[in-house]
Amino acid sequence: MDVASFRAIIKAQKAAGLDVERMLAVQNIINDVRSQGDAAVVDYTNRFDGQNYTNAEAFRVSPDRLKASWDELSPELQASLKTTKARIEAYERSILYQDMIGEEISYVYHPLEVAGFYIPGGKALYPSTVLMTVVPALVAGVTNFVVTTPVFADTSITFAALYLCGVTDNVFAIGGAQAIAAMAYGTETIPQVDKICGPGNAFVAMAKRLVNGDVAIDAIAGPSEILLYVDDSIPVDAIVYDIFAQAEHDQAARTFLLCESQSFADKIAARIEALLPTQKRRDIIQASITNNHYSIVDTREHLIAILNEIAAEHVSIQHRDQDEIVAQVQYAGAVFKGYYAMEAIGDYVAGPSHVLPTGGTARFSHGLTSNDFRTANAVINIQHATYDQIAPAGELLAEAEGLYAHQASIAIRKAESPYDEK
């Protein structure tokens, strides 16, 4: 498969996300939440999610319930969540931008006032998404949180992860586009936020797309994807389980598998067929693997062109020349180098957030980090001596642009400062 073919796949995937009928349906939900507040959220949640809420307070999750969820976990699972949280914290602190304080020019950072989080819960429970989104915000200095998560099954482990993070207020058992709208615009019960983060289904993604600009969002997530490049020294079953791990996310997930020989690709295909019946989530995997794409690459140039064209959410390089190859990967949500850096470890305990750009958007965006929960501004404090040096240039530029009040604003300060300044 050539680069143009891969480009067409990505283009088709993006087009599928712009369903007009879905957009209109979601816009109606948003409009209703904006105009009716809690009543609309209750109505849509009962209608779509099979709940029987009578009022908005009914879907507020109490701090006691969150604590009870944590207490119910086994010590081993508590320890696993703590290990994951600690690794995320360490990574996020290591990449947190620091203020630059200069004598005349500074650049300073400020945490967002209120951050909102959507934790999916339809086909599976995702306590890992709690940690991968909330912990970066904590490291950034955010202190006010709003969390929405749909309730379709036992959500205790998701609630437990929130308790571990210290997020025990403004947690709501709702999902869907109505949850996004409620966080974006606020209701009588649900506070308005400054930014919404977290993945969801196609309706959640559309809602985030439509409220973007009224609030900030992390990204518009499409179906999850992985690009695997492997040589024939890698055990076939390990590759198959990497593919299954990607496929079991949901039916729309996809894998791009690049190999050096057709015979090795055939071995992988045969083991997929043999192992699929043994998988607990085989129905989802079976649907997902129909989205897979396989290709044989015979030159390094061809490989790198494909890697950077697809700009996949996850890029896994398990190859004898992996150092050289990874050095040339310019566009990817996250790169997993080597046999022991499988994508599944990145989904849980590696450290970087698993909220990553999909659908080729890694060509211009990056995965969620602590820096995404802060704003920044320059602080400009020009002193008299510097003014004398740079004012003439400013005056001439203002005159050239025909902005004469700008020119006068600069020129009028040639006299001494009215207060003590050097």
Question: Which ranges hold each PLM region?
Answer:
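N-terminal Rossmann-like NAD(P)+-binding subdomain of aldehyde/semialdehyde dehydrogenases
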Residues: 1-113
